[in-house]
Every structure is written in structure tokens, then in C-alpha cells.
């Protein structure tokens, strides 16, 4: 909430900034970061999506774990079992849910808008490929600055139309 609302103000308060990189993952933070970056019309911006959390090698994935409360209430799990399943649901640090919910959808839409590098959405969080995407994003925003390309040049009506078509094609979340 407050932290995200302040982002555009904080970005503008940095007199020497030449570009902005946003790093975000989840349901609320990623769309809010996209809005903040989109408001930086005269600056180059890029989003590094947080990727997807890897599923556990043992236990249940995040989608199934969301039902532990109901299963506990129905005496299908003990409190200890529920706690253990919850702790094992994520096999990598960071990242969004392991299903195409709001966080994953927002990552794909950010890429379709041109705010994120191609093939950066849903990269496995914390893995070498995600770290490489982060490095490439930093290089890309420097290149945008070197060529005078700003967010206004990227977020066009065509970019928004592209994002809508991509969203419809992959059937992303509409929450």
C-alpha cells in the first residue's frame, strides 16, 4: 500500500536518475510496480519479474497447499502435518505462485507490454536463468537510455493492444 504509492514520488526525488528498474513478483506488488514504471513517461524503465517459485521435490505445491486450512478444519490433516506441508510448498526463494494466477498473469502481461524483456516472465525464481535475466535487464535499460528510448515510446496503444491479445490467448487470471 503505502510503500507502493510512494514509488513514483521516490523515483522523481532522485535528481541523478537516468532510468528505473523495477523488481516485483506477486499479485499486488507487480501490478503496482507496472503502474509506477508506466508513470515515468520520460525515463527508460524496465521490469524484472520475480519469476515463479519452483514446486517442492517432496510435499504439495502452492496450489494444493492453499487448501490446508479447510483440510485441517475437516480433520483431514493434523496441525503438525499442515505446518509441514506449508513449509515445504516452495522449493526456491522468491517468485510467484506455481500456477497461472494473478502474479504469473501480470508477469506475462508486463512482457507483452514491452516493460519486461522477452522470455523473462515466469522464469524459475532464484535460479541462474533468473539472475541472467536480471543482468540482461540492467544492460537493456542502459541501452534504452543510450538511445533515448523512454517508457512513453514503449507503452503505446499497440503495446496495450498486444497485451490484451496475449492475455486473451493464454487465458490468464482476471482477478
Language model segments and positions:
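Mobile "lid/hinge" segments at catalytic clefts and subdomain interfaces of large enzymes
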Residues: 36-175
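A short, small-residue-rich loop immediately preceding and capping a beta-strand
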Residues: 11-33, 44-49
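Generic hydrophobic alpha-helical segments
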Residues: 8-11, 141
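Short, small-residue-biased leader/transition segments that mark boundaries at the very start
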Residues: 1-7
